[in-house]
Structure formats: C-alpha cells, structure tokens
Amino acid sequence: MLQFTDTHVNVESGKNVDAFTTIKKIMTIEKPDLVVLTGDVATDGNPEKTYKEFEAIFTEAKMPWIVTLGNHDSQADLSRKEVADFLQNLNYCLNNDQGETYGHSNFVYPVRSTDNKNKALIYVMDSNAYSTLKPEVDGWGWFDNSQVSWYKEKSREFTQLNNNRPLPAIAFFHIPLPEYYQAWKNKKVKAIGKRKEQECGPEINTGMFAAMLEAKDVMGTFVGHDHNNDYIGVHYNMALAYGRVTKTKTYNKAPIEGGRIIVLKEGKRSFDTWIREVNGKKVYPCTWPDSFVE
C-alpha cells in the first residue's frame, strides 16, 4: 500500500495542486493495491471539489483509497462529520465509518487472502484536531477514551475469530502518538529516516499505544502531521512511522515530496517499507522487525 500525507490541496485557488502529479507519478512507479491519505488533505476552500479531483485520479487508476482526517481537514466549508460522510460516497473510497465511537472515519479494513479469510487488519482512526481542554491544555487533539475502548473491542473481536491469535495489523491516523519521540530517542535501536522538527503530538496521553501493545496485533502505526519528519523507529518493538509529506509548498526545509510504501507479508508478522520520492528515488528501505533488532 502507498501512504501520502499532508497534501493541503485547494483546487479553487490552485494551492498545492502539483501534489496530484506527485501522486500519479509514484502510483505509476509503485503500482500499489491501496492508497491511504493520512490527513490534512483538502484544508481550505471547497473541499468537495478537491476530493472530487482525488476521486477522478483514483477512479482512472481503478485504485481503492482511504482517508484519515487531519487537524486541518475541518477548517474549510465542511465539518469533520460532513467530510467523513462525503468521502464514503466517492468512487473507490473504502471509508466506512459506522459511528461506533468518538470522532469520524474510525473503521477496520480486513485484508483477505484468495480464500477470503482475514489475514491482516488495517485500522483507520481519527486522531482528532485540537485540544478539547483549552485553555488549561493547549495543542493538538488526542484519541478519546471511547476510541481506545473501541480499538480494544475490535481487536478482541478479530482475535477471537482467528482462534484467539492476533492478526497482523497496522494503523493509520494523522497526529503522532506521544510515544513517537521515545522511538526516535531509542538508543538501542536506531530509527531510519529524518527528524527535522519536534514531534507535534498531543499533550494528553489516553493510552492508545499501551492498548495496542497489550492487544498484540498492531505491528506499526503510520502518521503525517509533522511535514519535516519521515522516520520509522520502534518503541517496545512496535514500529512508529511517519509518511513523507506530499504537498509541494511546505514550511521550512521539508524533504522532497513523496510517499511511503508498506508491503505486508501474508501469514507473517512482518512488513517492508520505504520512501519513494517524486524524482523516482527510493530511500530508507527497511523491514520490520528485522531492521530493528537490538
């Protein structure tokens, strides 16, 4: 699968529309089975027009796609719920929020084998936007306690259906968990990639990382949000990864725009991953867990 993140496109003003070219180029090179946009996709102007452009690209390619909401995705003309509802009706979009928990676009997508059995899981979650406890607590949003409970229940259900063995899983959302900094600072296992800005995670930690460790299904999480970071590290052997920023007009000295590839391996708790830049260059190839052994 191919992760793009933080496109910040506005087709009405022409802002960052070159991101469409980046997406098409990298899709042509990598030929993924699924594209995931991890937030801050259509952040101002008329998001419906922008998402229709994404729909046209993926429809032409016959490419299934998924969107997680970023903190900026509800700052245009639509609320987060309206964005989530709109996405579910677009061609090839797999978003399927059943309204089971706090936030919007929280769902699990099972990856099935040729015999139609669940072999892996993709968790898609809304990491929300901004603190709901201002002015006492500032900063970014965090997973609500009900979302942590929802994840635990979904993991438990799929584990029970698999003879009480956790299925290999990965999770996509926008804002990094607080534990990302610990993965970067891990002195025993060096992260792969670049960290050019401080992790902008939430001030409040509601325990999603701990829940995933306890459930033993999630191998790694993949986020965006911090445009200048593209590393993958481990914390307690769970991979914590950034995608590569896909927008063309970004702040500071961000890396060349691109996307992150994740290749799951049927029947194994392992995945390959790398960054593909718009110029065609492949950087930071690695395998979890083999590349992260102490």
Regions found by a protein language model. Give the residues of each.
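N-terminal active-site segment of His-dependent metallophosphoesterases
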Residues: 1-53
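Active-site-proximal beta-strand elements of phosphoester/diester hydrolases
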Residues: 1-11, 119-128, 172, 239-245
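Divalent metal-coordination and catalytic microenvironments
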Residues: 6, 23, 35, 40, ...
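Active-site environment of divalent metal-dependent phosphoester hydrolases
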Residues: 10-12, 43-48, 67-78, 130-133, ...
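Extracellular/periplasmic catalytic domains that process cell-envelope and extracellular macromolecules
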Residues: 19, 28-29, 58-61, 100-102, ...
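His/acidic metal-ligating clusters that form di-metal
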Residues: 31-33, 121-124, 136-230
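Extended active-site neighborhood of metal-dependent phosphoesterases/phosphodiesterases
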Residues: 52-163, 260-265
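Binuclear metal-dependent phosphoesterase catalytic core
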Residues: 108-116, 208-215, 229-294
